[in-house]
A protein has these predicted regions:
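Post-HExxH zinc-binding segment in Zn-dependent metallohydrolases
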Residues: 276-314
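C-terminal substrate/ligand-recognition segments
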Residues: 395-412
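Divalent metal-coordination and catalytic microenvironments
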Residues: 4, 140, 254, 287, ...
Length: 439
């Protein structure tokens, strides 16, 4: 197993380098440098590809299969084989084309979103869709799954569309009718802070450090779409500052949940499959735990509001945003009750994309139709509609279900951690820190 572990260490280190290049692309990369960056990431992908296509690694797999292994190594070997199958399933030339088109679309998405004009990205997105369909087809053949299920398996091996359908049937049957029947706030109060973004971030960093985010192994920056990336022991989270400071802080706590999870992976398995996240559903459960059950809790809000001199105005905005069902076209800003409906809509559209290979124009129409039927929202702005999320424009399909599954897991964690309620009843950072130890 030692030689196999060395191969996988190389694989994960190369992924780390790619992760840092991606972070730089999202935060600092000049517009005219996109082509060079896509070449850099494409070459890195080729090096990764060579690792798993070598005859030597196949021989090492066979040796390991004929060796008595520890329980940990047996599980690691199983995961290694799965990764190799998926990596080798995709043609290297297709991987390079995908990387280049993803970077192009990601930058065009920024422009299209800021100008509320999807025509800027429509052609390139349709080209990207063609490449993703080919990726899904190749992956499906290697994994004996449907094309869409093969993409879902990239993010969570424990779920496929049949299981996710059962999960979302509850949303269809129970949540959507109740949402449509509830009298909702249409325009919640928005708190306007007179504190600068940089000063708020400086004070919030103190709170995040108290929640175990290690700034000696991580950092916070700004980007067009909040995310958590970087590398092993170099976790980089981003946020964007909105007119509504609560939305910015909510996103920041969400990404901090991802970051704390990454920083607490077991050191002895950092460069093995066993030391990676269990799944993206579990990863999202950690981010949504931080967002929904810490930041959005009434008890922890008292800690946050100290920064704003215990503002009654901010408290009103907080209660209307996070403790009231309301009409909101934006997924990341949605209240906890309507949030899974937003995810459900994206899942429905993704299924249609891979069933009937619909293009951007039909995707946009389907998006608007579903928002009207399921959320009573008549969309006018494309920025608040099909352009609001970055995922599809980065070629990421099959990921959205992990948000709903993650929210479910986060709620289960909260339900099974009675100490957490006790500690939040006496809201101070030390008590919250203690409760996190028990999760």
């Amino acid at each position: 197993m030692n030689k196999l572990k060395e191969y996988f260490k190389s694989y994960y280190v190369l992924n780390d380098v790619s992760g840092l290049l991606f972070w730089d692309n999202a935060t600092n990369l000049p517009k005219k440098s996109i082509e060079s960056r896509s070449e850099q990431m494409s070459i890195l992908s080729n090096f990764t590809d060579r690792i798993f296509r070598s005859e030597d690694i196949q021989e090492e797999i066979q040796k390991a299969e004929n060796t008595k292994l520890s329980e940990a190594d047996s599980m690691s070997l199983k995961l290694m084989k799965s990764i190799i199958v998926k990596e080798n399933a995709i043609d290297p030339d297709l991987k390079s084309l995908l990387i280049k088109k993803k970077l192009t679309c990601e930058h065009l998405w920024r422009e299209a979103r800021s100008k509320n004009d999807s025509s800027i990205i429509e052609k390139d997105f349709n080209d990207l869709l063609d490449l993703v369909h080919e990726e899904a087809s190749q992956l499906a053949k290697a994994t004996n799954l449907s094309p869409y299920d093969s993409l879902i398996s990239k993010y969570d091996m424990d779920y496929d569309s049949s299981k996710i359908d059962k999960f979302f049937s509850v949303i269809e049957r129970e949540i959507i009718p109740k949402y449509l029947d509830i009298k909702k706030i249409k325009s919640p109060h928005v708190y306007k802070s007179n504190i600068s973004d940089s000063e708020i971030l400086k004070m919030i960093k103190v709170k995040l450090k108290q929640l175990n985010f290690d700034f000696d192994r991580g950092r916070i920056d700004q980007s067009h779409h909040p995310f958590c990336g970087g590398a092993t022991n170099d976790v980089r989270i981003t946020t964007r500052f909105e007119d509504n400071i609560l939305e910015s802080l909510s996103a920041l706590f969400h990404e901090t949940g991802h970051g704390v999870y990454e920083q607490n992976r077991p050191n002895e398995y950092l460069y093995e499959p066993l030391g990676q996240s269990r799944s993206l559903s579990v990863h999202e459960s950690q981010s949504l735990f931080f967002e929904n059950h810490i930041f959005k809790s009434k008890a922890y809000f008292k800690i946050i509001n100290n920064i704003f001199d215990n503002s009654k105005d901010l408290e009103k905005s907080f209660l209307e945003h996070y403790h009231t069902v309301r009409v909101n076209p934006i997924r990341v800003s949605a209240d906890e009750f309507s949030y899974p409906i937003h995810v459900y809509i994206r899942y429905k559209i993704e299924k249609e994309i891979f069933k009937n290979k619909i293009k951007f124009k039909d995707i946009k129409n389907l998006w608007n139709e579903n928002y009207l039927n399921n959320l009573s929202i008549n969309l006018i702005s494309e920025t608040e509609g099909v352009l609001q999320d970055i995922h599809w424009y980065e070629g990421i399909f099959g990921y959205f279900p992990t948000y709903a599954l993650g929210a479910m897991i986060a709620s289960q964690i909260k339900f099974n951690c009675p100490l957490f309620d006790i500690f939040l009843g006496n809201p101070n950072e030390e008590n919250i820190n203690l409760s996190l130890i028990h999760i």
